[in-house]
Swiss-Prot record:
Note: This gene appears to be the source locus of an SVA-mediated retrotransposition event that gave rise to SLC35G3, SLC35G4 and SLC35G5 genes.
Ranges where the record places region Disordered: 1-25
Listed Pfam families: EamA
Places the protein is found: Membrane
Protein's name in the database: Solute carrier family 35 member G6
Entry keyword set: Membrane, Repeat, Transmembrane, Transmembrane helix
Lineage: Eukaryota, Metazoa, Chordata, Craniata, Vertebrata
Amino acid sequence: MAGSHPYLNPPDSTHPSPPSAPPSLRWHQCCQPSDATNGLLVALLGGGLPAGFVGPLSHMAYQASNLPSLELLICRCLFHLPIALLLKLRGDPLLGPPDIRGRAYFYALLNVLSIGCAYSAVQVVPAGNAATVRKGSSTVCSAVLTLCLESQGLSGYDWCGLLGSILGLIIIVGPGLWTLQEGITGVYTALGYGQAFVGGLALSLGLLVYRSLHFPSCLPTVAFLSGLVGLLGSVPGLFVLQPPVLPSDLPSWSCVGAVGILALVSFTCVSYAVTKAHPALVCAVLHSEVVVALILQYYMLHETVAPSDIVGAGVVLGSIAIITAWNLSCEREGKVEE
């Protein structure tokens, strides 16, 4: 009887207890950024910051060589095609599985539409304002569409950061909308803002479509399809709508190459981030593109930056800080072993 008492039995040497982890390792395992936080950081550093260079560089290429948006779109799509080599090496179908091929093509079409509208808008309105309208519309539409289609809500802090970022965008673009010039110049400016809005709407809808795609090699497949659809839609228009225009000097070629590389990096990071975090929060964090575009608009393009632009940019940065700080929550992994 006494031998069966748990406190009198000696420890079984054949089943040693697992060694306890050091305190630093336990802290690292118990407290690390969640998937949503990782997604937002990827969207901020890999999506918003590189994308902020795309608008000013596109405008510089247009100023130097009168390079239309159609040629810019074609050049960007060309950077997507080498991804086919990666898919071939992995043995994956280039166009994706047959059962989801329609949605993958639809996402590629929406992505090309968003890019084309963005490149067209930046040629008639300041780069910062075009990015502002596009990101603002994508954020609002993402919040509404996700709430209606996926019933995925947001916390109070998320809503605070989301509405604050939209307020910052209104502060930036509002004065310019109220002072549109009359005549043909005002019409072109209004058309540019309209294109930026449509581009943001297409972006938000495309992100929701991408979240519904679940298959191996999803990201490289849709990246290749975006380039393929963009070329198939743009190359015929190159000979129908206008005579082909090529960059005329080395700086123009450099701008075009930088646009293609930075846009591909931003596309990859945003597509990854939207699978980890709420689409509206991803779009809100992407408002960092607006701040970068305004800085480059002033220092590279030597365009005027109004005081309202500076105030709005500060509000946007503060809102991004709120969203990021709230989502920097710690996620416990594993349970305490007895």
